[in-house]
Each structure stands twice: as structure tokens, then as C-alpha cells.
């Protein structure tokens, strides 16, 4: 049975950077890794409503720097910066060294796979029809300038007794092209019928400059997204995969 490699893992060091940037000797490595996991778990719970996409942890000598990518920086910063100061004190207690928190605002959340997956999962938990949630997410991402997007949901869709998988795709999603900027995320929706898994792939274009372009991106002027109908663009595809034949009512 064929399996797919993780879209981000295969691109690390090519067009993607790691979420943790630090070095440690073998005796300290386990301790640092545990603290990183505690920081990510703490921030994920505390900033649940802030639409946090990514958390980058760096460890300069005798200190720590945490960069939070969020679509709602006002929630993280708080009134007059009170919340971010409190957040720095809490992270300092967890990491054991002075922690500095910086905010990276996400201008276009519809091009972020994690935020799109969270939005779909939230709609599924509110009993929105899964096809409507998928199609809405695809349309919003393509309207925001994505070159292609694929959304997949799996589980007891619509309350069916037999679990199945359905997907929806528009545009190109070249998973085997390493220079392709593919954003990927998974999310779980806890519904009354059980857990539904959500996967999102978003193709945002190609990075021809490699890691130099990733680390030092050139400023670009915002332009309205062009909707072409080139190879694979403007095409919609649907798919369905079941462990067994779906019941006649579906």
C-alpha cells in the first residue's frame, strides 16, 4: 500500500526551516526538547482564540526567544502590552532562562494550512455540512492567491455508520517538487458522532532562491490574485474513498 512522505519534513533545509533553532550538548538535549514541548503545549492552550499558526523557538546564549505567528496579534499583545509581558514571565518560568516574545502577524490567513484546517474543524464541530465547509475553504484560499489547495476529511461524515474519506481539490498541488512552497497541516474535529480528521495542503508558488530566499525574503508589493486557467488551474476535483461501500442514504 503506497504511503506519502510528510510534505514539510521532506522540504526541511530546502525551502522550509525548522520550528526550533538551537544547539545543545547530549546531556542537555532531552531537557531542552522537553521544555520546548511544554512551551508549545502551554501556548496552544492559552492562545487558542488567537489563531496561532506557528511557534518558532530560538535559544541564544543564556536566553530564549519565542516567535509567535498569529492572525490576531491584538489578542496576544493585549491592552497596552499587558498580556505579552505576562506571557514573557510565564515562559521564563517554564524555560528557566529569560524569554523574549515577538509577534509575527499573518496577513493572509486563508493561505495558512493550519488556520484553514482549524476553520474547517470548527465548522464541523458546529454541525456545518462537511462538503460546504470544504468548498468554502477552497474558494477562500484560491481567492486569496493560492496556486492550488487540497482538503481531505475522514471519519463518520454526516453521521454515517461507516467511516470514509472524501477530498476536494482545486488548482495544482505538486507534492514531488521540492522547490514548491507547500504548506500542510492536520486537525481533529470532535463531533457528537466521533472524531473527524482534517488535512489541508496549500500550494503558494515556487521558491527558486532556496533557503536564502526563505531566511531573507524580498519585500513584494501586494497585488490582486490572478485567476488563470493554465495547467491544472481553475479545475475542481472531488474524490471519495471508503473502507466498504457507503450506505445507500449517503
Curated annotation (Swiss-Prot):
Region (Disordered): 214-250
Biological processes, Gene Ontology terms: translation
Residues annotated as transmembrane: none
UniProt GO molecular function: mRNA binding; rRNA binding; structural constituent of ribosome
Xref: SMART domains: KH
Compositionally biased region (Basic and acidic residues): 220-250
Domain of life: Bacteria
Keywords annotated in UniProt: Ribonucleoprotein, Ribosomal protein, RNA-binding, rRNA-binding
Cysteine pairings via disulfide bonds: none
Subunit-level organization: Part of the 30S ribosomal subunit. Forms a tight complex with proteins S10 and S14.
Record protein name field: Small ribosomal subunit protein uS3
Organism expressing this protein natively: Acinetobacter baylyi (strain ATCC 33305 / BD413 / ADP1)
Amino acid at each position: 500500500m503506497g504511503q506519502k512522505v510528510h510534505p514539510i519534513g521532506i522540504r526541511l533545509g530546502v525551502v522550509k526551516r525548522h520550528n526550533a533553532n538551537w544547539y545543545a550538548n547530549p546531556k542537555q538535549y532531552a531537557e531542552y526538547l522537553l521544555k520546548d514541548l511544554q512551551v508549545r503545549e502551554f501556548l496552544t492552550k492559552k492562545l487558542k482564540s488567537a489563531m496561532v499558526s506557528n511557534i518558532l523557538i530560538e535559544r541564544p546564549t543564556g536566553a530564549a526567544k519565542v516567535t509567535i505567528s498569529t492572525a490576531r496579534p491584538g489578542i496576544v499583545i493585549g491592552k497596552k502590552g499587558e498580556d505579552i509581558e505576562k506571557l514573557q514571565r510565564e515562559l521564563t518560568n517554564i524555560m528557566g532562562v529569560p524569554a523574549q516574545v515577538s509577534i509575527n502577524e499573518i496577513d493572509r490567513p486563508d493561505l495558512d494550512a493550519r488556520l484553514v484546517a482549524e476553520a474547517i474543524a470548527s465548522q464541523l464541530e458546529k454541525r456545518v455540512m462537511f462538503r460546504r465547509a470544504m468548498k468554502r475553504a477552497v474558494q477562500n484560499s484560491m481567492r486569496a492567491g493560492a496556486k492550488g489547495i487540497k482538503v481531505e476529511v475522514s471519519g463518520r461524515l454526516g453521521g454515517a455508520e461507516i467511516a470514509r474519506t472524501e477530498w476536494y481539490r482545486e488548482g495544482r498541488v505538486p507534492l514531488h517538487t521540492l522547490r514548491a512552497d507547500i504548506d500542510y497541516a492536520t486537525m481533529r474535529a470532535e463531533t457528537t458522532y466521533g472524531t473527524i480528521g482534517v488535512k489541508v495542503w496549500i500550494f503558494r508558488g515556487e521558491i527558486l532562491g532556496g533557503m536564502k530566499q526563505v531566511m531573507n525574503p524580498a519585500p513584494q508589493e501586494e497585488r490582486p490574485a490572478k485567476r488563470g486557467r493554465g495547467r491544472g488551474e481553475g479545475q475542481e476535483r472531488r474524490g471519495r474513498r471508503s473502507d466498504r461501500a457507503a450506505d445507500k442514504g449517503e
